[in-house]
């Protein structure tokens, strides 16, 4: 590779390394969050998910550039186009690393809420599961009775987030949700454009919580546990369908913790669920297990590289709920 190509790789890589050495809270407060807020205001003027346009364009380049390089190699009978492509790919990778370490990692590594004391005493966990079961059962018919469309559910989740935090996140439905599905994602916070993008084709019981969760990321709650907690608290301020969606997600995480602590108590409580709630509970289990194999490994590695405990980080919201209910 030419000298300028090496420089184009080394400079962003060095800056990315520097970002990891700087205080993450300072980077979050002075760079990442102000940038996301500014870009969010700009992209909020259109219903088109700008971030989706960008990653579709990048995906097209990933497919087309190797084909072009292969054609040029055959035409010119030279490996030079392939070497150029490798250099360009390395440059793009280094720039991507810089974008993540500057615009997302500081937010993900900075805790916004006080850390809860990890306490999962069986009695407290039993009580939490029973409370969430009762809440879900009391609201179980609301989602079927609601005439809200997917877009309206997303808007309602944004309104609930604004009611809780005083700020409305920028959450948009993906135009091609199946592409997110192929990646094992229900939604994504795209810090480059200040948007949260979610799959609008999700089941209605899933969509409000996913929208609120990704919206929490867009507002600066980078921890998965914090984003889950904020989403749950926000949805409890909304209409009954939103409260039901929030209760079902919280119930899933509480029951998942109970299954590890006391499998017999878990089995007893799942058998006590009504058919309607049990159906949605099973849907949530399938949803949480959708990412498998390589996709699950990549997600786990990404979370760990950003200072979290892998995929188990989502369930840590239960520690917050248990602490809130503690005497």
Regions found by a protein language model. Give the residues of each.
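Alpha-helical transmembrane segments
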Residues: 5-19
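Transmembrane alpha-helices and immediately adjacent membrane-cytoplasm interface residues
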Residues: 60-68, 80-114
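Membrane-embedded alpha-helical segments of integral membrane proteins
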Residues: 15-71
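Alpha-helical transmembrane signal-anchor/signal-peptide segments
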Residues: 28, 105-127
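Active-site recognition of the HExxH zinc-binding catalytic motif
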Residues: 47, 207-228, 232-233
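Post-HExxH zinc-binding segment in Zn-dependent metallohydrolases
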Residues: 128-132, 222-263
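Pan-zinc metallopeptidase signature
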Residues: 273-327
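Auxiliary, metal-adjacent structural segments of Zn-dependent hydrolase domains
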Residues: 141-194, 200, 204
């Amino acid at each position: 590779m030419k000298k300028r190509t090496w420089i184009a790789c080394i400079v962003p890589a060095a800056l990315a390394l520097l970002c990891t050495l700087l205080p993450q809270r300072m980077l979050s407060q002075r760079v990442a969050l102000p940038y996301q807020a500014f870009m969010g205001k700009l992209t909020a003027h259109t219903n088109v998910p700008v971030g989706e346009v960008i990653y579709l364009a990048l995906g097209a380049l990933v497919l087309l550039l190797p084909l072009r390089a292969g054609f040029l190699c055959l035409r010119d009978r030279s490996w030079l186009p392939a070497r150029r492509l490798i250099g360009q790919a390395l440059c793009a990778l280094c720039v991507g690393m810089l974008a993540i370490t500057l615009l997302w990692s500081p937010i993900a590594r900075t805790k916004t809420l006080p850390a809860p004391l990890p306490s999962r005493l069986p009695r407290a966990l039993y009580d939490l599961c029973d409370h969430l079961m009762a809440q879900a059962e009391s609201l179980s018919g609301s989602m079927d009775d609601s005439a809200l469309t997917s877009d309206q559910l997303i808007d309602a989740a944004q309104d609930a987030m604004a009611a809780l935090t005083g700020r409305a996140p920028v959450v948009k439905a993906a135009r091609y949700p199946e592409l997110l599905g192929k990646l094992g994602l229900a939604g994504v916070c795209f810090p480059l454009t200040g948007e949260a993008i979610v799959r609008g084709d999700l089941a209605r019981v899933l969509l409000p919580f996913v929208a609120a969760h990704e919206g929490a990321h867009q507002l600066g709650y980078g921890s998965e546990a914090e984003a889950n907690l904020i989403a749950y608290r926000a949805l409890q301020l909304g209409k009954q369908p939103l409260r039901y969606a929030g209760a079902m997600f919280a119930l899933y995480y509480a029951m998942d913790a109970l299954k590890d602590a006391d499998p017999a108590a878990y089995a007893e409580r799942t058998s006590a669920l009504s058919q309607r709630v049990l159906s949605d509970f099973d849907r949530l289990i399938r949803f949480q297990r959708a990412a498998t194999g390589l996709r699950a490994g990549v997600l786990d590695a990404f979370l760990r590289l950003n200072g979290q405990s892998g995929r188990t980080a989502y369930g840590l919201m239960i520690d917050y709920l248990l602490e809130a209910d503690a005497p």
